[in-house]
Every structure is written in C-alpha cells, then in structure tokens.
A protein has these predicted regions:
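Helix-loop boundary and gating motifs at the non-cytosolic
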Residues: 6-53, 216-226, 237
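Loop-to-transmembrane helix entry/capping segments in MFS-fold secondary transporters
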Residues: 42-43, 127-137, 234-235, 318-330
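Helix-to-loop junctions at the C-terminal end of transmembrane segments
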Residues: 59-71, 156, 251-263, 349-350
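Structural signature of the two symmetry-related core transmembrane helices
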Residues: 74-88, 266-281, 362
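Paired small-residue
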Residues: 97-105, 290-298
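Intracellular juxtamembrane helix-capping segments at the cytosolic ends
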Residues: 112-125, 305-318
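A late C-terminal transmembrane helix in Major Facilitator Superfamily
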Residues: 320-351
C-alpha cells in the first residue's frame, strides 16, 4: 500500500472513531440519568451499562471466523447499519428489560466498528510512529466523548431527543468507513485462545481489563456520584464526564510520545500508581470545584493511558494474521472489565455509600498494580534462568 493511501485510510478511521466517541459521550450519561429518573438503583443502572461489554465478550470469540467468512467490510457495513437503528429505539421503549436487549445489540454493533478500527490502525501504523498514532486515536475518541457529553447536557433528559441526535451521528460516522477496502492478504487466525494470551501476556491483557473496568464504571456512574455535590443538577452532573474525558484526550498524547522513547513497563507502573492515588482521594476533594476538575482530569487521563500503552504494546508484539486475534483478545478482556465495572462499583455505592465510587476503584487498581509488578518480576526471573 502506498504511503498516500495509508495516510488516507488512517484519516478515514480517525474521523469515524471521533464521531463514535461523540455517540458514546451522548449515550453513557444520558442512559444513566434517564434510568435514574425512572427510580432505578445504582447497581441496576450499572448492570444496564454493562450490557455493551457483555455483548463484546459474547461476540469476540466468533469475530475471526466472521471476518474470514464475510470479509472486513461486510462486517463493518452490517454494524454501521444496526448501530443507529438500535440507538433510535431506546427512547421509544421505556422498559428496563428491553433496554438491556437494545444495549446488548448496540454493544454487538459497536464492537464490530471498534475492533476493525483498531485492527486497521495497528496494521496501517508504522512501528516508529505507532505510539503517537495510537495516542492520537485514543485522544480523538476522548475528544468525541467531550463533545458528546456537552451535547447531552444541552438536551432535556425527559424528551429523549439526545438518543435521536446520537443515532443521526451514527449514520454520519458510517460515511468515511463505507467505502473502505479490506486489507490485502489478511485472512485471520480463527483459533482465539483467550487463556493463552492471558498467560503469555498478563500485563498486556491486564491493562485492557483494568482500563475497561475503570472506564465503564466512571463513565456510567460518575454522573450519579456527582449529583449530591451539584445539588442534584442533572446537567452539571453529566458535564463532570466532560472533565473526565478532557484528561482522556490530553494525557494519552503525552504517554504515547513517552511510549516511543522509554520503557513501557515502568510507564505502566507509574500510570497505575497515579490512578490508585487520585481515585482514593477523589471523594474527599469532590466538593471543591477546582480540585474536582483537576482530579477528574488526572483520573480520566490515567485510565485512557492504560488503553494507549496496552494497544501500543499489542501492535509491537503481534503482526500479520495473529494481529486480529490478539486484538480480539485485548478487547475481550477490556470488555470483561466493562461488564464488571459498572454493576460492581454500583453495588459498592449501594452498600457502602456514595464515596465507595472512588475508594472501591482505588482498591481494584491497587490489586492490578500488585499483579502487574509480580507478573513482570516472574517473567524477568524466567528469562534470566534461560540465560
């Protein structure tokens, strides 16, 4: 592929993924706050938010076979059609059980767009620029998220109009991707062993899991956590997600630049430490506006940096036919985190109070940090014994 076509295809994917970020930014706070107005508990709201992650876990084991049978663009076009239709049905059916089903369908469609976009980004990016390109990719998702949250905060929740706006943007996002071509010579390895990837690359797959857990929990439940601090103002509580996303926009660019120059294992440890400390302090300082914005910025940035650094390592370690299966495994573990994050943190908030939002996630982050350091120490010892 010529350099011109490579850059053109990269630009198409980056534009589309920015619009997908807008869709996420509208749907996440809008869905949580809509259910809250129905009188739904935080744990059930979290469970509803986890439906998209559950869909990803269900579909990813079959993803490689589907690509080989229907082609990359066959899968992509199907997902681009289903996504806006499912979103548009949300305000029509005000039934929690139907919402579970619709969010599951949205998750299936979003997974196809998401996974193929990541495969294309990693396949099109050159190694010497991989960290920066993936950082740009993740930052553009966050930029879209900020725009989406701001759009959501301007539309009254009671009207359901935000969902129709989101569906319209989903249609627009299909335009740059619709005429993409399959990557040449890209049959995919169909035997995806998630256990093998977990054992051989625990730090890499663990980074996707912790990112999914923290990202989904904060995006879904931050507006609920924020309500008592903003006098139950729904618009203000939804805007807190924009501050979270601003960190997700800026910090990965810096981390991606560092990832091309410095030791990635140390970077992962530093990121983990920052996330644990800021999450632990968050409930204590949240009623101070300036500190609230600062800490949300840092929390969001550290969470998205798990993703940026993990995806950079993935593209560096896996090439060719195994790239799609490795990427599917990466998203599988991320989605396991997404499934667990909202309902588990929501249940902690129901049991232990609102402040459990930050403290419980800090404990989970600390456990991951210990596992990551231990697994890398074991790996280094094994390599030294071989020498």
């Amino acid at each position: 592929m010529s350099n011109k076509n490579r850059l053109k295809n990269l630009a198409k994917v980056l534009l589309a993924i920015t619009l997908v970020g807008v869709i996420i930014g509208i749907n996440l706070p809008l869905s949580s706050l809509t259910l809250q107005t129905w009188g739904i508990s935080a744990s059930v709201i979290g469970f509803a938010a986890s439906m998209t992650g559950l869909a990803t876990v269900v579909i990813t084991p079959f993803f490689s076979k589907l690509i080989n049978r229907f082609g990359q663009m066959g899968i992509m076009r199907f997902c681009l059609v289903v996504l806006p239709i499912a979103i548009a049905f949300l305000p029509i059916f005000q039934n929690i059980y139907l919402w579970f089903l619709l969010r599951f369908i949205i998750g299936v469609a979003a997974t196809g767009v998401w996974l193929l976009s990541e495969v294309w980004i990693n396949a099109l990016a050159e190694d010497q620029h991989r960290g920066k390109i993936i950082a740009l990719y993740s930052s553009l998702i966050s930029l879209g998220l900020i725009v989406g949250v701001l759009i959501s905060s301007l539309i009254p929740i009671e009207t359901g109009g935000g969902f129709f706006v989101s569906a319209g943007i989903a249609i627009i996002s299909a335009i740059p991707l619709w005429n993409m071509e399959d990557l040449p010579d890209f049959d995919v390895v169909e035997d995806i062993s998630f256990y093998r990837y977990m054992v051989t690359a625990p730090g890499l797959m663990g980074s996707s899991w912790i990112m999914g857990f923290l990202y989904a929990a904060t995006a879904a439940l931050l507006p609920i956590f924020a309500l008592p601090f903003v006098e139950n103002d729904y618009a203000q509580s939804s805007r807190t997600v924009a501050w979270l996303a601003s960190g997700e926009l800026v910090m990965p660019l810096f981390v991606g630049w560092l990832a091309d120059r410095y030791d990635k294992t140390r970077l992962m440890i530093y990121i983990s430490c920052v996330s644990v400390i800021t999450l632990a302090i968050l409930p204590v300082i949240f009623d101070i506006a300036v500190m609230r914005f600062l800490f949300l910025f840092i929390v969001g940035g550290s969470i998205m940096s798990f993703y940026t650094l993990g995806l950079t390592l993935l593209g560096q370690e896996y090439k060719g036919k195994v790239l799609a299966s490795a990427n599917a495994s990466f998203i599988f573990f991320l989605s396991l985190g997404e499934i667990l994050g909202p309902p588990v943190v929501g249940a902690a908030m129901d049991l232990f109070g609102n402040n459990a939002f930050g403290w419980f996630m800090a404990i989970i982050g600390l456990i991951y940090l210990i596992i990551f350091i231990g697994s890398n120490a074991a790996g280094n010892l094994k390599r030294s014994n071989k020498i």
